[in-house]
Amino acid sequence: MLRVMTSRNFLTIDDFDIRGKTILLRVDMNSPMDTQGHILDDMRIKSHIATLKDLESAKVVLLAHQSRPGKKDFTTMKPHAHLLSRYLGKQVTYVDDIFGTFAKTHIASMEDGDVIMLENVRFYSEESLERTPAEQANTYMVKKLAPFVDIFLNDAFAVAHRSHLSVVGFTEVLPSGAGRVMEKELVSLDRGVKGGERPSIFVLGGAKVDDSLRVTENVLTSGGADRVLLTGVVANVALAASGVNIGKVNMDFIKSQGYENQIEKARGLLAKFKDRIGLPKDVALNDNRERVEVHISELNSDSLPINDIGLETIVDYTNEIQNSKTVVLNGPAGVSEIEDFALGTHEIIKAAIKSDFSIIGGGHISVEVAHLGLEHRFSHISTGGGACIDYLAGEKLPGVESLKAAYIKYQEAKKL
């Protein structure tokens, strides 16, 4: 079944002889939907086309989820199958079942080249329980579906940080590897965090302060980055930690988001990595939606909301980014929804595409990249969300670890 080829610590499509085989493919097609059930953004659906094209000689059974219980968009996979049919150029059959007789009958009757979409896996209550791969392998879903398929491929990087049934359970009982989305995410993020050309710069912003500080600590401690440049709310937290009076309104916002406790963590990182963390020299205040440039030494208790990095900081940061070989961006530099305060974000994006290898970590900055029409100028744009952040922060992802374990099993089997 296997064609020995990979030098990585996980298997990919290229390691399998997939002709005529039945492939269970876990994808991530979780998409925003309107109240009528129409998909508003099909990016994640389109992202799996390359994987499916490479599996055309096989029978492909898709496992996916949409939203989660209690949400208004927690619905069936029927609209996803419809859109996927259009993009794939052939029928993707929606099956209103997960592992019952109806689903198994469809799988057993498939011919080479067929693609079916099983029902939302989160309709099954055990799916979202966080358990070990061995425990997940002992569930009804795995026991019922596994005998009908030959190979499991995980292409759902965005849920790789979850130890959910459909993410880790099948790797225990089936030959398992990564689909093209998963493969590209792991190779690209690994290069950004570990093997990128130097100098390597991380530019972190947005409103999720704890995530940015986790990533900062990991990449500076591990040597994955030479420098980290801070923007957005995390920069405000770091400025406060460094002794700058950022103003009551800005401190109140930090407190309202539950990030006051992150000031001490930022202080510790600044003390440990003083010369490797870049902070803004100036900022842009929002005066009734008008941009007002202020040096940080001029900030005081009455200062207006900080909505962007200042012009001097933009020049400093973009010069440093342009002279780097590897650049990883995560989170916008300011309130980019307001045109006057999108300047820092846009200039950083334009500078990043001039580096040899550039990564967008996802989130709101991806929206700004699309707004500028520069998606294809980046080496990689992650669709991982929380999984991407955890990976950049050095966390082990259950979905990835289960693929590594499957690879070890394969290596051990070779020795027998």
Swiss-Prot record:
Signal peptide: none
Catalyzed reactions: (2R)-3-phosphoglycerate + ATP = (2R)-3-phospho-glyceroyl phosphate + ADP
SUPFAM superfamilies: Phosphoglycerate kinase (SSF53748)
Gene Ontology molecular functions: ADP binding; ATP binding; phosphoglycerate kinase activity
Coiled-coil segments: none
Family annotation (Pfam families): PGK
EC number, as in UniProt: 2.7.2.3
Chain sites annotated for binding substrate: 28-30, 44, 65-68, 122, 162
Entry binding sites for ATP: 337, 362-365
UniProt family annotation: Belongs to the phosphoglycerate kinase family.
Complexes and interactors: Monomer.
Protein name (Swiss-Prot/TrEMBL): Phosphoglycerate kinase 2
Species this protein is from: Methanosarcina acetivorans (strain ATCC 35395 / DSM 2834 / JCM 12185 / C2A)
Source taxonomy: Archaea, Methanobacteriati, Methanobacteriota, Stenosarchaea group, Methanomicrobia
